[in-house]
Swiss-Prot record:
The species this protein was found in: Proteus mirabilis (strain HI4320)
Domain of life: Bacteria
Gene Ontology CC entries for this record: plasma membrane
Keyword Thylakoid: no
The family this protein is said to belong to: Belongs to the UPF0283 family.
Membrane topology: Multi-pass membrane protein
Annotated localization: Cell inner membrane
HAMAP family the UniProt entry points to: UPF0283
Protein name as annotated: UPF0283 membrane protein PMI1371
Transmembrane segments: 69-89, 99-119
Keywords: Cell inner membrane, Cell membrane, Membrane, Transmembrane, Transmembrane helix
Length: 348
């Protein structure tokens, strides 16, 4: 109670007045159309597509000087052969050598047929490249809030897939559209109402091919026959998936698609394969419960399913928004079919 009072402290007001208060500059935000909702799956697909492009550019052979010289020499040789053939036909006509003219006509028809085949193959390869461009455009539209580009784009996709205007899903999609819908909303509605028709068919093909590969490996005792059968089934699966999505494959376009699928699996699919299959197998100890052939059959079936899933991604015109197929979707089905088959075989 008897403590002495503290001395008074006087503050200078000038220091507070002269002190400059630093404030951040205010930001004025416009309407909501400038903001895009964050979608982690679309971002993951964008990163995967960027990785795939880097892989393709790395694997693409660079044009060297020798290849350019060979190209020029081949062009000169081709022009010389055509000129020589024209001169030979002219001399045969002057000399009335009808046998030579007949041979020249047959050779000309063969050349025309070969050129037609080359043009057809080029068109099919171009169609496969165009599908990749369409997928990139769809990814851009999914981030766009503009109006006027989404509807004709989706109508063109439906036409390419063979879905006519009288299809129930197409009619339901058309009835849900309004003038106020932007491009992103139109594509989302199309991916929810129309695109699942083709996805369901592709999933059924993958399930059937994976089940056949699993049962073939688990039951058949011939390894070489198994390898040939699975290779043939995998090529047929890729052709069937491409046909479902409206892509007609030729010889070189089929090889290109198969190469893209294998490259995608090798570089982008190994981690997903280990994550979805390895941990589940270790937790349930399936390898100990099943025989060696059965385990090999399940592995072959899952690889076939993985190949089909990547073929879907490369042939599908739209990027995945939701319901992306995973190996876990086919794993339980394969195990159940294998157990039923082995159980029936033991009873017999």
């Amino acid at each position: 109670m008897n403590e002495p009072l503290k001395s008074r402290i006087d503050f200078k007001q000038s220091t507070l007045q002269n002190e400059e208060i630093s404030l951040k500059k205010g930001l004025d935000f416009n309407q909501d159309e400038q903001f895009v909702p964050y979608n982690p799956q679309l971002e993951a697909q964008e990163n995967e597509g960027r990785l795939e492009g880097e892989i393709q550019s790395a694997l693409k052979p660079r044009k060297s000087l020798w290849k350019r010289l060979i190209t020029v020499a081949s062009t000169i040789l081709g022009v010389s052969v055509i000129a020589q053939a024209g001169q030979w036909i002219y001399q045969s006509w002057i000399n009335s050598d009808w046998i030579a003219l007949g041979a020249a006509s047959a050779g000309g028809l063969i050349v025309i047929a070969g050129m037609g085949s080359v043009i057809t193959e080029w068109r099919r390869i171009y169609r496969l490249r165009q599908r990749a461009d369409e997928r990139d455009k769809a990814r851009e539209l999914l981030y766009s809030h503009a109006i006027g580009n989404g509807r004709p784009f989706c109508e063109d996709l439906a036409k390419q897939a063979g879905i006519n205007s009288q299809h129930p899903a197409y009619i339901r999609w058309q009835s849900t559209l309004h003038d106020t819908h932007n491009d992103r909303e139109i594509l989302e509605l199309y991916s929810q109402l129309v695109q699942p028709i083709l996805d369901k068919q592709a999933r059924a093909e993958i399930s059937r091919s994976a089940a056949e590969s699993t049962l073939m490996i688990a039951v058949s005792p011939l390894a070489m026959v198994d390898m040939a059968f699975i290779g043939w089934r995998n090529i047929r699966l890729i052709n069937r998936i491409a046909q479902i999505y409206g892509i007609e494959l030729g010889y070189y376009s089929r090889l290109k698609l198969f190469r893209l699928v294998l490259v995608n699996i090798a570089f982008a699919g190994a981690t997903e394969l280990v994550r979805e299959v390895g941990m589940d197998w270790l937790s349930q100890d399936l390898a100990a419960r099943l025989s060696t052939r059965a385990a090999q059959g399940i592995g072959a079936g899952l690889l076939t399913a993985r190949l089909g899933i990547k073929a879907m991604e490369l042939c599908r015109p739209l990027p995945w928004i939701d319901n992306k197929p995973k190996l876990s979707d086919f794993r339980k089905e394969l195990i159940g079919q294998l157990k039923n088959t082995l159980g029936n075989k033991k009873k017999e």
